[in-house]
Amino acid sequence: KEEAEATFKWWLDIFGEDYYIELQRHDIPDQIYVNDTLLQYAKKYNVKVIATNDAHYVDQADANAHDILLCINTGEKQATPKMKDFGDDDMMVKGKRFAFYNDQFYFKTQSEMTNLFEDVPQAIDYTNEIVDKVQLLDLKRDILLPAFPIPPTFKIHDDDVLNQWEYLKHLTFEGAKKRYVDIDAEHEERINFELFTIKTMGFAGYFLIVMDFIRAGRDMGVFVGPGRGSAAGSVVAYCIGITNIDPMKYNLLFERFLNPDRKSMPDIDTDFDDDGRQRVIDYVVEKYGKNQVAQLITYGTMAAKTSIKDVARVMDLPISESNALSKFVPERPGISLNRLIYAPLSGDGSLADKENLSPDEMANAKTLRSILEDQKDVRSNILKEALVLEGSVRNTGVHAAGLIIAPSDLTDLIPIAVAKDSNLYVTQFEGEVIESGSVIKMDFLGLRTLSIIKTALNLIKQNHGVEIDIDTIPLDDVTTFELYQHGETNGTFQFESPGMQKYLKELKPDKFEDLIAMNALYRPGPLEYIPTYIKRKHGRESIVYDLPEMEEILKETYGVTVYQEQVMLLSQRLANFTKGDADTLRKAMGKKQKDVLDKMKSKFIAGCEKNNFAPKVCEKIWTDWEAFAQYAFNKSHSTCYAFVAYQTA
């Protein structure tokens, strides 16, 4: 007790007026004794007391589910006797398991807390006092970027962000002279549009950082991919060497990458050969400092099948019965047990409508509901607890590719942690939350195909004395296309599956654009449009455009809407959408955002009517888009990966 009082006074001397004593009441004997002692000290030294509750679950009824979760985490069975007398969470006693003392560790209401501390009413008042003192952590702030060093010549403004933009502008036009033989008015207009958008959003530093580590990687002999995702739609990125695909040649759109009407975080992901990836990460850590670079945490949650199996193990259901019960859940990623049990079977928002369950899967869902309703069936309790635990965090991991680079020590900006499988700090926030906090996330990906290409080129040089620059090979090589036409694509990146080989033999691709289209079409959803694409290429099916104005944009894909970029361009051409509007439409169609689409439809029809297009035709175009545009693919990404595939062949 004397030691406790000395510690009490030590903290009081440090914090003074901001020192409070926390009281919790969970009906635990040891806690009752400690509270009495703390109240004595508080009275003796005139220290304020506050009331809190140690909440580990929301509702009191979830206490058992929480106990099961503890058993899952510790590998115990719930039938194992509980160890309630402990002074240390890490204490282990043979034949007993860790458990909470009772069911009082839930989120209590204001009235419950007031009643619980009715003998110490000031504890509630002082709790509110602390709330008033707390400064809210607002994650919404200006983009957080390291100060990228630039030559003194470009430090012409008081604002570092503007100076970085001046340097980026210089590098872009210098790079454009090398990329393009002649910079015509169209090139200049596109470059200026992109630079203006980058300047407005304050992202120049981001481009410089990515350019720098890609350049460093190449200098170290690391193989870097030609680009990935929507960033390949940027001419600025192409001119400064971030990407290696000319966006203007393939009609790739910058606004697919950065929407000029809506500030959103840029996202440039980069592929490296397997060995080179770590060397580039090491370069970044050395340049910016270990305290400013972190990997991203991932949270593994309990999915439908997992929650059933985990709960069944804890509740000692035989494995055979556990497996049989979990088999009633369809083998589909993202399927929800709560939806299977509680969603309507038919009609709007039903299992038939949203999940599109087969008759057998629908019958299994009904079986699960029957089991839950049968209170005498032990499996009913398992389902009941599995429903509560579905979505709970089961484990943490480290994102395979994600990295953040901060302008200062990360401990001053976001919560961080350490992980046994990472040499770097790990964020406690996941990627989406990190980005909403204006911390830049970048993906450093290892691509085995680049390692294969690198090895092949080294062997050619070693055995034949020929050095090949794989990034400048001609894209009209007849022999290469013959491989594709015969379906001889074993080991060829993205084109090696038997289904793809079958379609390649039918398509007989003879131009690079065919490979881009096939890369975009060969995936669930648009797969059914491949036969139409093939027939139209070979003239076995006529190409019909709803409006003549659509031909310019859809001609390359024989009238089939393959790419998101085509929808974006058509909306601008037919309905005078801005570049920003077009990107908003693309995103809404891909994510099936009905409320946004309803507004955009009215705008589209009105814009078309202004341009004297028949409303009926425009309605049909919109309906076609709604049916297919959710499957339309990112042309920038497809072009980059078709290029890697061509290099592989």
Where does each model-flagged region fall?
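Alpha-helical scaffold/interaction cores of sigma-54-like transcription cofactors
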Residues: 1-649
